[in-house]
Design a protein with these regions (language model features):
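Short, conserved active-site entrance elements at the starts or edges of catalytic domains
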Residues: 1-18
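Proteins with a high burden of low-complexity, intrinsically disordered sequence enriched in S/T/G/P/A and R
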Residues: 2, 63, 107-108
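Metallo-beta-lactamase
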Residues: 6, 18-95
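Short, electropositive alpha-helical surface patch
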Residues: 92-108
């Protein structure tokens, strides 16, 4: 997926697939499920059960920006489903974004 793509699931239900840029990998995707409360599936860009892991295909300098994009997709009231661990809120994603920026020496 390059950019964003809307997937029609039928029955009037659609989801948005979004390439949020490199971070955990070179091609991180998120899925936004619109609803009364937005739900964003984050993959391993967000990890609740421990510190996010950066493997050899990670792009640390861009990871915080990918999390900013996740927050833009879902908004302040969304629920974020991480690749590992329990569902989190926007405050958790922001805190993880700031921790990764500090860890990898990335400024705003």
């Amino acid at each position: 997926v390059c950019g964003e793509w809307t997937l029609d699931l039928g029955g009037g239900r659609q989801v948005l697939l979004a390439n949020v840029g490199p971070g955990h990998t070179g091609h991180d995707l998120a899925v936004l499920v619109p609803g009364e409360v937005e739900v964003v599936f984050c993959g391993d860009l967000v990890e609740e059960s421990g510190e996010p892991q950066a493997g050899p295909d990670a792009v640390p300098a861009h990871w915080p920006a990918a999390l900013d994009r996740l927050l833009e997709l879902g908004g302040a009231d969304a629920r974020y489903v991480p690749g590992h661990g329990a569902v989190v809120d926007a405050a958790f994603v922001r805190a993880q974004r700031d921790a990764l920026a500090a860890r990898f020496g990335v400024s705003r």
